[in-house]
Structures are given as structure tokens and as C-alpha cells.
């Protein structure tokens, strides 16, 4: 009976899920990936649907567990890495209220320029 960790790489184009056996060395036991949509708009918008992230995580979790004989009770760790600088707006219950803004979204370039030019001035930073 070994010890295992499950890891999730939640990227821009999809999620990659792996189960690793932990010991003197770390051994890949099972892996699966699944893509999801990136909605790109003519005005520079780039958005993603958070529910698609969750659905892909659930699906790949089932796939990696189905492909190996690891007992879920032997999974002693979980690891996440993900895309950065996205924005998910949520309500008071933590539910997303719209698609997430991707870090690739370019719709606020004018606001960014104004913020840098007229926002708080930090010595040496701007």
C-alpha cells in the first residue's frame, strides 16, 4: 500500500491531471488531460467559462483513477498550479457570475495607460 499525490495543472487551454506514487522517488502512475474553450472576441476580449474548468477537473480525476488501481484513501496530497492573472467575479456565495477574464484580455488597454499615467506614483516603480 503506497502513498500517492494527485496534481492538477489548470492551464489556458486545458487541465492536466496526474497521480504520482510517492517514495524514495516520485513515479508517474496515471495521467489524463482535457481541453476547454477560450472565447476570443474581435474587440480584444478573451474569456473562459469557470464551469468548464471544474468539469474538466472532475472528468480527468475520474479518468486517472479509472486507469490505475490506486485506492483514493491512499492519496495523501493534492497539488495545483494554474494560469495567472485571470479574474473570476463571484457572488456572495462564491459562485461565478460571468465568464472569467483571461490574462490575455486586451479590452482595458486605455484604462491601463491612464492608470499608469495618472494613478498613484511610486518612487522608482513608475
Identify the meaning behind each predicted range.
Residues 53:
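Nucleotide-sugar donor-binding/catalytic module of glycosyltransferases
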Residues 5, 10-50, 95-103:
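Short glycine-rich, Thr/Ser-proximal phosphate-binding strand/loop in the N-terminal lobe
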Residues 42-45, 59-126:
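Glycine-rich phosphate-binding/catalytic subdomain of phosphoryl-transfer
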Amino acid at each position: 500500500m503506497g502513498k500517492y499525490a494527485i496534481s492538477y495543472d489548470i492551464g489556458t487551454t486545458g487541465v492536466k491531471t496526474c497521480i504520482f506514487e510517492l517514495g524514495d522517488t516520485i513515479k508517474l502512475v496515471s495521467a489524463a488531460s482535457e481541453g476547454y474553450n477560450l472565447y476570443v472576441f474581435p474587440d480584444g476580449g478573451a474569456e473562459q467559462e469557470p464551469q468548464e474548468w471544474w468539469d474538466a477537473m472532475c472528468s480527468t480525476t475520474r479518468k486517472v483513477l479509472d486507469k490505475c488501481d490506486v485506492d483514493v484513501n491512499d492519496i495523501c496530497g493534492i497539488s495545483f498550479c494554474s494560469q495567472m492573472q485571470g479574474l473570476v467575479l463571484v457572488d456572495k456565495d462564491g459562485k461565478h457570475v460571468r465568464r472569467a477574464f483571461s490574462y490575455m484580455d486586451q479590452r482595458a488597454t486605455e484604462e491601463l495607460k491612464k492608470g499608469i499615467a495618472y494613478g498613484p506614483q511610486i518612487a522608482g516603480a513608475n
